[in-house]
Amino acid sequence: GQPLGATFRATHTTTFIALKPGLLTNDGPDYCGDISVQRLDIDCPACLPPLGHSITPALFAGSLQPRPRNTHKGRHGDAGVLGGDTGMVGAALLAGRAALWVGSGRVYVGLLDPGAPAVDPGRPELMLRQARKLPEQLTALAIGPGLGTGAEAATMLAAALDADCPLVLDADALNLVGRDPALQARLVAREAATLLTPHPAEAAR
């Protein structure tokens, strides 16, 4: 996934037998354009196990169906976002907006910043509140955007890890887990669906 020496940006790239990780990671997508695979009548899975799986819109087609006209937000799940400490409220608001964008019915954003706004003017349907006042019953919870790494953040993360709802761990939630064996143990013990979204530095921790 790295350009070496004099490199041009292709509009199309043909690769043989199977996709290569470098075409899909780091700088690869910016240089490859549209990618096609020529199998050469070779069944790649019979040769080597895959190193990973690419994420494509088709994977989510069943979950991102257009809403019926005769519906309302209460029928499409309650998403929670927990984060937004002082100076980082925007990170939690962006996550909340993303939850709306992918179809969540109601989105609650719990903010740690005591001076956080009461409304997001860009998406006033977001329900903003103090972090400790998020509803207990959520369809899914994302924790970490702008969370910070203080004691209060760690306490809230521990409670989230103990909850039964599906959980997305991002940003500072990953930083906290990376340095705390007790949080790591809670993460390993979870039975509900759990998704980690690290960038390379967070993954390295």
Protein language model regions, located:
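Proline/glycine-rich low-complexity loops and linkers
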Residues: 1-3, 203
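A conserved, positively charged/aromatic
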Residues: 6-7
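Small-residue (G/A/S/T)-rich helix-start motifs and N-terminal tracts that mark the onset
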Residues: 10-13, 18-171, 175-205
